[in-house]
Curated annotation (Swiss-Prot):
Binding site for Mg(2+) 2: N598
Site (Transition state stabilizer) location in chain: H358, H392
Binding residues for Mg(2+) 1: E417, H419, E462
Cofactor(s) required for function per UniProt: Mg(2+); Na(+)
Keywords, in A-Z order: Glycosidase, Hydrolase, Magnesium, Metal-binding, Sodium
Protein family according to the UniProt entry: Belongs to the glycosyl hydrolase 2 family.
Binding site residues for substrate: N103, D202, E462, E538, Y539, A540, H541, N605, W1000
UniProt protein name: Beta-galactosidase
Organism: Shigella dysenteriae serotype 1 (strain Sd197)
Length: 1024
């Protein structure tokens, strides 16, 4: 044990938090989570241990702007100004100090290992009692599961130790410091330390004791560590559970270790042995260790599909069977290896349906509770994810247990990121920083290696490629050869990774960055000498309204076996709740706390909002990742299972044939598909229909029974095909009265029955409509070529730094947002059965023509207005965001009914999950409440739209809400939006894709850009 004076002044003078060679003082060695059961049955059933006591709850807390500001008396007694805070928590969520959101830029001046003198410091204290029996024998430990970023610990006024690494436990022996009766803990937590230079992750920078604190009492002679691993024969019919156990204390001949393996109530295998490891060299072996091998016949294998869990109980006892203590862990029999360029689990090539997940809660910051963790896992499973990357640090210990039991593959990542360094490997190539990096990697492995869900180790994130990475890669491969190691830094294919693991590499497009080119994923596989699998550690940047082009990745994954999937960036929006002056909550992002530097809304890249409400993009991910694929040939549906291990024993295939959303025939068929097998389903012959409508076949895979992660009736997969229908002839309708045209100096007015249409002759726009005496428009019907910018349109542009390559900057520079209409033509003609209005406009900016729009409005005797639009786009202007029409309707109706793709928001490059049907939703559901307002709510492939008294027919895309594009564009946060008068309707003949390969460079694929130059579309507007 390191001994230094207990004096606070001496501790402050030492400044351990500015010395990369001091990562801990008196911290105990890492190990798997312990409970020190004194009853093996309680260990087997994982009952709460009487030897493990939580110290979570109310602690005394004082915040100071620097560590030197606290008086020495704090070590002995609480300060008068002390507040009460809950542990675990981040002190910023209690109003102390400000959270800082920054992606790359360090929140402090870069001068490693030094940190600012003004270093916000939290002083925690807790008074507690200890059971007297704990003082009489054994060892009492205190465990801090997570403290950000570094801390010193005192007990009863005496200094105990020091720890850093915010995301792994720091554990200390308190035995020599405790006394009978009351005891007092004092913890000095520093916001910044030299460790902060290794924790430059894209997240909120927060501080405090944010994970659990507990006391653990272990016997004097104790289990110090244990490690389990599984080995198999070639066909996985026989396995060996290898358990290595290390003890601490007096090594006596009578000591024994028994390892028993349980499946529920049934003991599968057991073995007992004395201590004494195998001979390593001429000096012998480890006297304090023992390795046991338990043979298991026909083990039930673990996978994310079928997470079969056994329980291993490790007992330390005497030769006569007297139990000293027991530890236990869940066990999954599974094998991970790379062979022939493929990542295999139990001999089968994996397809990683993964997502990156930060530990984030909108109210609690970086504090995770079991309910939130389970909620995340259930949502992931329900949306066909099978893997999660712990980005970018080891997670709460409970997370891994839950992943073991529910079934998720885990990439466990070391808490190392130096993204803001120039160059990035400035520290990771520096041997002075190897000890700090080493502790972050080795302790992660030692804590988490018993978890079957952990299938890959990661050396960290965005830290370049340094010699320290190579050393740590070799250490892991030596200590744990059962798992591959991945690391993206330095180009994604360095010597420190077993897997090519790029971030944001595109499917077909090379990105030729200096020194580290980012090849297309297809090309990467074929580089000379390259034989490794490729799994994207990050892809499909889900920031705001995004995930366009996601289907292209999944087409490639299924086409090329060595493209084994990837991890979407990322799971949850990192917005935080603030309250306005009236106590109303609102969602905040970077800069909203006065934090500088900050990266604005770049913290919100989730597939779900911070409260775990899904984004529309989550449905697209679910559909592309679904485990059943379908092929239609005639009346035959071929279903292929992508499950590797699971028989489809809880699935029904439900099919429906519908004409314009009206079901004509349906049935359901039990599914019985073997893993990686096929099932052929024959549909009955359907009558040939003569119809002008659209005939669609839709199949859904439904789970009739509830599972551990889904309710009964859960839909896991679906597909839709348009069927051929006989042509039909629409008979002419009976003659109608002819609309009457009235011309004045200012307007053309057309009247029919109780309806009127007014076209302004000076503007050339439809300026008003009446039904009876009620006006229908608040603004004229005008062309629209812009959208409220998406995050993907904005890229890295901001007020002080403009990216001229960003779509929004190109549109602004070209004048798309400022374009004004100049009338070329506005004429009216009375035809035999209709009135025809013909208009032409140029849309100009600073004398330059950007668009020419020609329209005809044909109003016939039935009251229908057929609108034909032809648009020319100037060859030297950027491709527009949309080509459509917009107006502000006077009515506010409760519901929207449409025949088209839905029900969720969809865009031209993100619509594979949408189905053609007749949908009916509340108006409020047509708006997607992205925290940073933008273009939202589009529905594509629409044939008919009904809203209030109006109906539109044609082939178009639309969005409809209470918010104008102008308001969306000018508003920084969703809570600042106000419902405008009436309803804004946007009807597009064409709409650009949204992109999403990344959010900092234009990523809309060429096929989804509006590059044709000439566009033509039609629609009919009538009143029901």
């Amino acid at each position: 044990m390191t001994m230094i004076t207990d004096s606070l002044a001496v501790v402050l003078q030492r400044r351990d938090w500015e010395n990369p060679g001091v990562t801990q003082l008196n911290r105990l060695a890492a190990h798997p989570p312990f409970a020190s059961w004194r009853n093996s049955e309680e260990a087997r059933t994982n009952r709460p241990s009487q030897q493990l006591r939580s110290l979570n709850g109310e602690w005394q807390f004082v915040w100071f702007p620097a560590p030197e500001a606290v008086p020495e008396s704090w070590l002995e007694c609480d300060l008068p100004v002390a507040d009460t805070v809950v542990v675990p928590s981040n002190w910023q969520m209690h109003g102390y100090d400000a959270p800082i959101y920054t992606n790359v830029t360090y929140p402090i001046t870069v001068n490693p290992p030094f940190v600012p003198t003004e270093n916000p410091t939290g002083y925690y204290s807790l008074t507690f009692n200890v059971d007297e029996s704990w003082l009489q024998e054994g060892q009492t430990r205190i465990i801090f599961d997570g403290v950000n970023s570094a801390f010193h610990l005192w007990c009863n006024g005496r200094w105990v130790g020091y720890g850093q690494d915010s995301r792994l436990p720091s554990e200390f022996d308190l035995s020599a410091f405790l006394r009978a009766g009351e005891n007092r803990l004092a913890v000095m937590v520093l916001r910044w330390s030299d460790g902060s230079y290794l924790e430059d992750q894209d997240m909120w920078r927060m501080s405090g004791i944010f994970r659990d604190v507990s006391l653990l009492h272990k016997p004097t002679t104790q289990i110090r560590d244990f490690h389990v691993a599984t080995r198999f024969n070639d066909d996985f019919s026989r396995a060996v559970l290898e358990a290595e156990v290390q003890m601490y204390g007096e090594l006596r001949d009578e000591l024994r270790v028994t390892v028993s393996l349980w499946q529920g109530e049934t003991q599968v295998a057991s073995g007992t042995a004395p201590f004494g490891g195998e001979i390593i060299h001429e000096r012998g072996g480890y006297a304090d260790r023992v390795t046991l091998g338990l043979n298991v016949e026909n083990p039930k294998l673990w996978s994310a599909e079928i997470p079969n869990i056994y329980r291993a109980v490790v007992e330390l006892h005497t030769a006569d069977g007297t139990l000293i203590e027991a530890e236990a862990c869940d066990v999954g029999f599974r094998e991970v290896r790379i062979e022939n360029g493929l990542l295999l689990l139990n001999g089968k090539p994996l397809l990683i349906r993964g997502v990156n997940r930060h530990e984030h809660h909108p109210l609690h910051g970086q504090v995770m509770d079991e309910q939130t963790m389970v909620q995340d896992i259930l949502l992931m499973k329900q949306n066909n994810f099978n893997a999660v990357r712990c980005s970018h640090y080891p997670n709460h210990p409970l997370w891994y247990t839950l992943c073991d039991r529910y079934g998720l593959y885990v990439v466990d990542e070391a808490n190392i990121e130096t993204h803001g360094m120039v160059p990035m490997n400035r520290l990771t190539d520096d041997p002075r920083w190897l000890p700090a990096m080493s502790e972050r990697v080795t302790r992660m492995v030692q804590r988490d290696r018993n978890h079957p869900s952990v299938i890959i180790w990661s050396l960290g994130n965005e830290s370049g490629h340094g010699a320290n990475h190579d050393a740590l890669y070799r250490w892991i491969k030596s200590v744990d050869p059962s798992r591959p190691v991945q690391y993206e830094g330095g180009g994604a294919d360095t010597s420190a990774t077993d897997i090519i693991c790029p971030m944001y590499a595109r499917v077909d497009e090379d990105q030729l960055f200096p020194a580290v080119p980012k090849w297309s994923i297809k090309k990467w596989l074929s580089l000379p000498g390259e034989t490794r699998p490729l799994i994207l550690c990050e892809y499909a940047h889900a920031m705001g309204n995004s995930l366009g082009g996601f289907a292209k990745y999944w087409q490639a994954f299924r086409q090329y076996p060595r493209l084994q999937g990837g991890f979407v960036w990322d799971w949850v929006d990192q917005s935080l709740i603030k309250y306005d002056e009236n106590g109303n909550p609102w969602s905040a992002y970077g800069g909203d706390f006065g934090d500088t530097p900050n990266d604005r809304q770049f913290c919100m890249n989730g597939l779900v909002f911070a409260d775990r409400t899904p984004h529309p993009a989550l449905t697209e991910a679910k559909h592309q990742q679904q485990f059943f694929q379908f092929r239609l040939s005639g009346r035959t549906i071929e279903v292929t299972s992508e499950y590797l291990f699971r028989q489809s024993d809880n699935e029904l295939l439900h099919w429906t044939v519908a004409l314009d959303g009206k079901p004509l025939a349906s049935s359901e068929v039990p599914m019985n598909v073997a893993p990686q097998g096929k099932q052929v389903i024959e549909l009955p012959e359907l009558p040939r229909l003569e119809s002008t409508g659209q005939l669609w076949l839709t199949v859904h895979v439904v789970q009739p029974n509830a599972t551990a992660w889904s309710e009964a009736g859960h839909i896991s997969a679906w597909q839709q095909w348009r069927l051929a229908a006989n042509l039909s002839v629409t008979l002419p309708s009976a003659p109608h009265a002819i609309p009457q045209l009235t011309t004045s100096e200012t307007d053309f007015c057309i009247e029919l029955d109780n309806k009127r249409w007014q076209f302004n002759r000076q503007s050339g726009f439809l300026s008003q409509m009446w039904i009876g005496d009620e006006k229908q428009l608040l603004t004229p019907l005008r062309d629209q070529f812009t959208r409220a910018p998406l995050d993907n349109d904005i890229g890295v542009s901001e007020a002080t730094r403009i990216d001229p390559n960003a779509w929004v900057e190109r549109w602004k520079a070209a004048g798309h947002y400022q374009a004004e209409a100049a009338l070329l033509q506005c004429t009216a003609d009375t035809l035999a059965d209709a009135v025809l209005i013909t208009t032409a406009h140029t849309w100009q900016h600073q004398g330059k023509t950007l668009f020419i729009s020609r329209k005809t409005y044909r109003i016939d005797g039935s009251g229908q207005m057929a609108i034909t639009v032809d648009v020319e786009v100037a060859s030297d202007t950027p491709h527009p965001a949309r080509i459509g029409l917009t107006c502000q309707l006077a009515q506010v109706a409760e519901r929207v009914n449409w025949l088209g793709l839905g029900p969720q928001e969809n865009y031209p490059d993100r619509l594979t999950a949408a189905c053609f049907d007749r949908w009916d939703l509340p108006l409020s559901d047509m708006y997607t409440p992205y925290v940073f307002p933008s273009e939202n709510g589009l529905r594509c492939g629409t044939r008919e739209l009904n809203y209030g008294p109006h109906q539109w027919r044609g082939d178009f895309q639309f969005n409809i809400s209470r918010y104008s594009q102008q308001q969306l564009m000018e508003t920084s946060h969703r809570h600042l939006l106000h419902a405008e008068e009436g309803t804004w309707l946007n009807i597009d003949g064409f709409h650009m894709g949204i992109g999403g390969d990344d959010s900092w460079s234009p990523s809309v694929s060429a096929e989804f850009q509006l590059s044709a130059g000439r566009y033509h579309y039609q629609l009919v507007w009538c009143q029901k």
